[in-house]
């Protein structure tokens, strides 16, 4: 699956759906598209399936997943913000919990301490554009995924190359906008590592609903799958 946010009309439809279903909205309006698309990728997962948020930031996506009913949640980030810890504490207080609603690890998404073949879905929301070594990230995520599990990625995107000044920093990190060529190379790298791209056709951009630092662009979402084990393949084929 490869999806591109096309315009404000599409974004408005996503927000309306999330509101109707009484799900928490992201503080950045455009990021609600990421969560809307992510929700589709979660449709076949059980509530207890282990899910890892790679680059969890302030925990907004972890909270979204929790509100969807998922119980086995793990977040990893280079720095653990006070906002994330405050959200944990508030949830524990409101729900009279003795344990936090999700586990948080400090570390790199390009070489984590997560055990191999232990995750049913890994996701990375607006993270890889901030100086991440994409090949190392893909390789380590492939390692931690169970056979047949998936990786969901969103990132900043525009079909043509957008020059980003080195002086622009986001969260103290470098920033880039992926173009069609970079996404194609990412998909090629994923295939070499062993992922099965669900779709190779990258949709065209019809609008730029995101503007930051004077640059207009959009978002792209990718869903990649680690192949199932040979025994699982035989079972699915009725052998």
Identify the meaning behind each predicted range.
Residues 2, 15-44:
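Class I SAM-dependent methyltransferase Rossmann-like catalytic core
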Residues 48-57:
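Conserved class I S-adenosyl-L-methionine
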Residues 60-111:
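Class I SAM-dependent methyltransferase SAM/SAH-binding core
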Residues 123:
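A conserved beta-strand element that flanks and buttresses the S-adenosyl-L-methionine
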Residues 135-150:
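A short glycine-rich, Lys/Arg-flanked "PGG" loop and its adjoining helix->strand segment in the class I
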Residues 153-155, 159:
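Acidic carboxylate diad motif detector
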Residues 164-196:
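Conserved Class I S-adenosyl-L-methionine
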Residues 193, 201-239:
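Core SAM-dependent methyltransferase catalytic element
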